[in-house]
Swiss-Prot record:
Transit peptide extent on chain: 1-30
EC number from the UniProt entry: 2.7.8.23
Keyword Cell division: no
Any Pfam family the entry gives: PEP_mutase
Gene Ontology cellular component terms for the protein in this record: chloroplast; chloroplast stroma
UniProt name for this protein: Carboxyvinyl-carboxyphosphonate phosphorylmutase, chloroplastic
Main location: plastid
Superkingdom of source: Eukaryota
GO molecular function per UniProt: carboxyvinyl-carboxyphosphonate phosphorylmutase activity; oxo-acid-lyase activity
Length: 339
């Protein structure tokens, strides 16, 4: 029985999921090579995790925020679908962002922060196991070093919002396997995410652990259980899930905030702060515009703003003046001097 036939003929209920006895997936003739073949492939993220033990990734949503992430010394960054939906569309994370929009942003973000690897949020991958191949290849072409791929039903929502639904586990495992095939030998780190925890207060955590372990067998590099409720759940995830583990730190979300060292102790490897920059910049923008509206001037707000010189340094203005001078005439451009 093929993988896609198994998906069509297998009905899994989130509240009664039993992935330890999942014959349709395990009998698949590809199963032998689906057991996380990337264990032998050293991507940039594999190396970062092995070198640092734990990697802290702030979120970014455009070229400028990515440049700031790099210049402030972080070793990696993350393009948040939530943040991009807000900044690009002015809309909530409600399934409105498309894969081509994420890929286009990934291209500008990676160009703006070329010295650090960037993971992109692929959401549900733009469709089924076939659609995900284009999504992954587009992100690789854009320069991304990895992506998150989640098992929500479309239209998806932010992982910390109510009303989420998930697709059958084996269907998402097939999408992970398809993504792995699309990656091939590319330097690309695949994170499998499950949102099933929020669908059942009684069995959601157990189902989540079973799901991400299945997704690891299908070819993921790391597992991501979204929205654990407390430290006990975090510790269970750290103990019982396979491979590298991702933890999402959202200010105001349902998961308690922790430092990287605290999460490392619980068994995590990649710590994402996807909305920190977005929330901070939003508050700063609201504050300065209120000041301008009320006072008609920003002269009493200058200490809370970047200066003209600071901002020009951030976007590397001096290097552009140097290029302008170099190409001002042919002799300079060719590096020749008058004899």
């Amino acid at each position: 029985m093929s993988m896609l036939m198994a998906v069509k003929t297998t009905s899994l209920c989130c509240s009664s999921l039993n992935l330890t006895a999942s014959p349709t997936f395990r009998r698949n003739p590809r199963a032998a090579r689906l057991v996380n073949p990337t264990a032998r492939i050293q991507t940039r993220f594999h190396r970062l995790i092995e070198e640092q033990g734990i990697v802290l990734m702030p979120g970014c949503y455009d070229a400028l925020s990515a440049a700031i992430v790099q210049q402030t010394g972080f070793s990696a960054g993350f393009i948040s679908g939530y943040a991009l939906s807000a900044s690009l569309l002015g809309k909530p994370d409600f399934g409105l962002l498309t894969p081509p929009e994420m890929a286009a942003t990934a291209r500008s973000v990676c160009a703006s922060a070329p010295n650090i690897p960037i993971i992109a949020d692929a959401d549900t991958g733009g469709g089924n196991a076939l659609n995900i191949q284009r999504t992954v290849k587009d992100l690789i072409a854009a320069g991304a070093a990895g992506c998150f791929l989640e098992d929500q039903a479309w239209p998806k929502k932010c992982g910390h919002m109510r009303g989420k639904q998930v697709i059958p586990a084996e269907e998402h495992a097939a999408k992970i396997a398809s993504a792995r095939d699309a990656i091939g030998d590319s330097d690309f780190f695949l994170v499998a995410r499950t949102d099933v925890r929020a669908t059942s207060a009684k069995s959601g955590l157990e189902d989540a652990i079973a799901r991400v372990n299945l997704y690891m067998e299908a070819g993921a590099d790391a597992s991501f259980v979204e929205a654990p409720r407390d430290d006990d759940e975090l510790k269970e995830i750290g103990k019982r899930t396979k491979g590298y583990r991702v933890c999402n730190m959202i200010e105001g979300g349902v998961t308690p905030l922790h430092t990287p060292d605290e999460l490392k102790e619980m068994g995590f490897h990649l710590i994402v702060h996807p909305l920190t920059a977005l929330y901070a910049s939003t508050r700063a923008l609201v504050d300065v515009l209120k000041t301008l509206k009320e006072n008609g001037s920003t002269r009493d707000h200058l200490q809370k703003m970047a200066t003209f010189e600071e901002f020009n340094s951030l976007v590397d203005l001096d290097s552009w003046f140097e290029l302008e001078a170099r190409y001002s005439n042919l002799r300079n451009a060719l590096g020749t001097t008058k004899s």
